[in-house]
């Protein structure tokens, strides 16, 4: 390995490395001068160097495409230049590629703006076909489009990314002397991806290959120096996987980084005050950070902290009630160690992963604020400070007491890009481990915040300056100015016709012809055009046409999560369950934590009669969203279908947690039959063993739903319906049947319909027989008499109602349909009276 490679990755050399380079003659070589400029952060000087000028000085024709020309010149220098040996040429081109990437990052992420123009280092013939630099930029941006996804139109100095991509991606196979090249390719890919509207499968495949290659570089992560670099690498991998929905892989990478650092982080409670006038200390959520070891003690391999005056200022809250920070009762108990750059980056990574894997909720926001407070308590590095402040502003914008600071802080974050007092070298420290958004994304966040606060004109000014026409349209649409939205889009189309503008016009007008024009302009490669056209079909319930457009869109770019979900819904509407299953399967592959997609996938499997698959997918859905009662309802039905009776009981309990009065009599009947009949579940176990759990469930159900006679009767059946060998179970069954009878007689109109009346009579007779059986096991004669008297009163009441309601007025005769019931009730009343007398004689 070329000795400076580790320093280039790290961003700075150690003193020992400088001495080693002198001994090896690195400093005096051509690549040594490039290396010196790179490590000083003077990237422009590399492009103005005579060596770079010579590489790109070859004549060309005006018709030659700029990417072809650049690649040809680089390859020619690598293969045919005789002034330097092969290894030296590779080193020079590598350093030029890294400088291109760093300058591009400076131009669009860190600032300050770069004062370098393509004319400074490229042949003037290349610019003859462009009347202005903006025309060149637009052409270069078109070359950077991948998988049919549009790229941000005001990206600054795109020629630098194009050159970095040519060197670090296209001709990487020729740079065999540079072992760390795959890592820089990964960084280039990551930066390129963040310019695209959607995730690119091509870039993800390339990123995965780069990660695999770096993993195989054993000598990259040895000794103390390698330990720091290993943490940085695994953090960068985690962010890549997070972006492409590979949440498990992202967590694995974060865990590796955390294990290497031996850093322990826990959200915990501590006594503290949050307001100025608070008298008592109460529990506050904080992040407790501890070191388990001292593996990162060699500070020469970690970036030196940036002076605070060169960091974005953490603005005060300036509230008359809420304190700027939580005031802890015992500050020393949770004293945080002095953290290095890599340790702070790990905390930021854990925070970002936590945010991605948890729902938007007040508790989640409090937990994230604990992370940001921890990070901001040690302001040391521009990238970490900026990332933490951006997250905090997003969290605070919903608070009336904090929104004013959120706006001021976002403005300060947006303004820092132009600030030239902080060197780019300081801003690039630990940059690739932090996923800082580009500067236009911060300005967009500011405009969105202004719009939410009602400052529509200020928000529009920023959006129009950024040429974010979609946001401009949204502003006008929400303000009810539909005509203005159309007008501004047509004005921009007069300047230049682009697929994105036609798609937006189609969104405003609801006109398919606009999407067709966008599709045509993109040479049939715009995933956005087909996506937007499909969504219009979906709104119009034209499902077949919708499916066709969505299929074309995902064929161009298969990593569109929202499109796969909408495609699945369209297939469901068409009752094409094979298609919907495929779409939702792709959806959950991209985002394993998408509960709704898992739920819809299970619906598809149910319709395809694949109930076991449906059961498993619903289990995944519940892992993602434990609070979604509709998913639990699907789960309980599927559980009973596949014979997972224990899971069905658990699901019923959860539904009672979520919906206080929830009831499903059909499910209760199935569970009862399974337990009583001794049915086997999906695992082959006999369901009789669930009797205790079922009794517990019925107890809970009847405590919530007290007025359903059928549920009370089912509950009685759990205890044998009064026919058990155990007296206590018969007693319990009698109580349930009594409550069921009470529910029956309190319902409307049961006595006016003879069929309903006969049902109630039969239930009263059954209750009386259970009472007789229970009374014989009573230890107290008084209790036995009381029980018998209550059922005798029921029967007498029914006899009275029968004579009152079902006697023919003309003949004075009782209805023949009730003759047998009347006889049975008379007989039983007499028996109950006799039995009561026997018990009274025992007083």
From Swiss-Prot:
Similarity-based family: Belongs to the TTC27 family.
UniProt protein name: Tetratricopeptide repeat protein 27
TPR repeats: from-to residues: 453-486, 492-525, 527-560, 561-594, 596-628, 629-662
SUPFAM superfamilies listed in its UniProt record: TPR-like (SSF48452)
Record-linked Pfam families: TPR_16 (PF13432)
Organism: Pongo abelii (Sumatran orangutan)
Gene coding for it: TTC27
PROSITE patterns from the UniProt entry: TPR, TPR_REGION
Record keyword Repeat present: yes
InterPro entries: TPR-like_helical_dom_sf, TPR_rpt, TTC27/Emw1
Taxonomic superkingdom: Eukaryota
Keywords: Repeat, TPR repeat
């Amino acid at each position: 390995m070329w000795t400076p490679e580790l320093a280039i990755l790290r961003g700075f050399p150690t003193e020992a490395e400088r001495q080693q380079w002198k001994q090896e003659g690195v400093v005096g070589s051509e690549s040594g001068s490039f290396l010196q400029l790179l490590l000083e952060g003077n990237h422009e000087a590399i492009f103005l160097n005579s060596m770079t000028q010579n590489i790109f000085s070859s004549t060309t024709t005006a018709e030659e495409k700029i990417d072809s020309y650049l690649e040809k010149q680089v390859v020619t220098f690598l293969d045919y230049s005789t002034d330097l040996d092969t290894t030296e040429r590779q080193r020079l081109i590598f350093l030029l590629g890294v400088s291109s990437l760093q300058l591009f990052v400076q131009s669009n992420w860190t600032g300050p703006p770069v004062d370098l123009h393509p004319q400074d280092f490229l042949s003037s013939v290349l610019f003859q076909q462009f009347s202005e630099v903006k025309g060149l930029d637009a052409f270069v941006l078109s070359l950077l489009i991948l998988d049919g996804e549009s790229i941000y139109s005001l990206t600054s100095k795109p020629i630098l990314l194009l050159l970095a991509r040519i060197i670090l991606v296209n001709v990487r196979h020729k740079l065999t002397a540079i072992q760390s090249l795959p890592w820089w390719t990964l960084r280039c890919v990551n930066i390129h991806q963040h310019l695209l509207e959607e995730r690119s499968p091509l870039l993800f495949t390339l990123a995965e290959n780069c990660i695999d290659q770096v993993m195989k570089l054993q000598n990259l992560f040895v000794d103390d120096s390698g330990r720091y670099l290993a943490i940085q690498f695994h953090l960068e991998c985690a962010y890549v996987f997070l972006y492409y929905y590979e949440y498990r892989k992202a967590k694995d990478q974060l865990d590796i980084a955390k294990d290497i650092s031996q850093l322990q982080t826990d959200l915990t409670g501590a006594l503290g005050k949050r307001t100025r006038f608070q008298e008592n200390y109460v529990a506050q959520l904080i992040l407790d950070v501890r070191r388990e070891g001292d593996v990162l003690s060699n500070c020469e391999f970690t970036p030196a902290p940036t002076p605070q005056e060169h960091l974005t200022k953490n603005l005060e809250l300036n509230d008359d009630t809420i304190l700027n920070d939580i005031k802890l009762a015992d500050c020393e108990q949770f004293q945080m160690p002095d953290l290095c750059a890599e340790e702070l980056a790990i905390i930021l990574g854990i925070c970002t992963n936590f945010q991605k894997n948890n729902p938007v909720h007040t508790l989640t926001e409090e937990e994230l604020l604990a992370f940001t407070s921890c990070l901001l308590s040690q302001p040391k590095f521009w990238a970490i400070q900026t990332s933490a402040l951006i997250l905090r502003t997003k969290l605070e914008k919903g608070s009336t007491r904090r929104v004013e600071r959120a706006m001021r802080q976002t403005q300060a974050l947006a303004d820092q890009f132009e600030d030239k007092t902080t060197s780019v070298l300081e801003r690039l420290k630990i940059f690739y481990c932090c996923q800082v958004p580009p500067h236009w994304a911060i300005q967009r966040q500011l405009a969105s915040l202004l719009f939410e606060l009602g400052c529509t004109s200020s928000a529009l000014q920023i959006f129009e300056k950024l040429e974010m026409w979609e946001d401009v349209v949204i502003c006008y649409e929400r303000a009810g100015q539909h005509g203005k939205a159309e007008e501004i889009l047509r004005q921009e189309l007069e300047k230049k016709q682009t697929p994105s503008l036609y798609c937006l016009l189609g969104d405003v007008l609801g006109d398919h012809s606009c999407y067709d024009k966008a599709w045509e302009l993109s040479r049939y490669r715009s995933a956005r055009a087909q996506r937007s056209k499909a969504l219009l079909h979906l709104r119009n319930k034209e499902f077949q046409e919708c499916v066709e457009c969505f299929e074309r869109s995902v064929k161009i770019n298969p990593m569109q999560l929202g499109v796969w979900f909408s495609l699945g819904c369209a297939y469901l509407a068409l009752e094409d369950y094979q298609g919907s299953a495929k779409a939702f399967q792709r959806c959950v592959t991209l985002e394993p934590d998408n509960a709704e997609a898992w739920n819809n996938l299970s619906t598809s499997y149910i319709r395809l009669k694949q109930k076991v698959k449906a059961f498993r997918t619903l289990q995944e859905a519940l892992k993602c969203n434990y609070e979604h009662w509709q998913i639990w309802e699907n789960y309980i039905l599927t559980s009973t279908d596949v014979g997972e009776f224990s899971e069905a009981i658990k699901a019923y309990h959860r539904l009672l947690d979520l919906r206080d009065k929830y009831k499903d009599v059909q499910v209760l009947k199935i569970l009862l039959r399974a337990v009583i009949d001794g049915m086997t579940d999906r695992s082959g176990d006999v369901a009789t063993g669930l009797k205790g759990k079922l009794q517990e469930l019925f107890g809970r159900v009847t405590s919530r739903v007290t007025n359903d006679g059928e549920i009370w009767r089912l509950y009685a059946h759990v205890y044998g319906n009064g026919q058990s060998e155990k007296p206590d179970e018969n007693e319990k069954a009698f109580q349930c049947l009594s409550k069921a009878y009470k529910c029956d007689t309190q319902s409307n109109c049961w006595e006016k319909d003879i069929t309903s009346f006969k049902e109630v009579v039969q239930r009263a007779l059954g209750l009386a027989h259970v009472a007789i059986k229970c009374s014989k096991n009573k230890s107290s004669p008084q209790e036995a008499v009381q029980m018998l008297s209550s059922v005798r009163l029921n029967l007498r009441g029914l006899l009275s109602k029968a004579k009152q309601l079902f006697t023919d007025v003309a003949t004075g005769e009782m209805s023949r349909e009730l003759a047998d019931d009347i006889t049975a009730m008379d007989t039983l009343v007499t028996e109950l009276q006799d039995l009561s007398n026997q018990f009274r004689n025992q007083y």
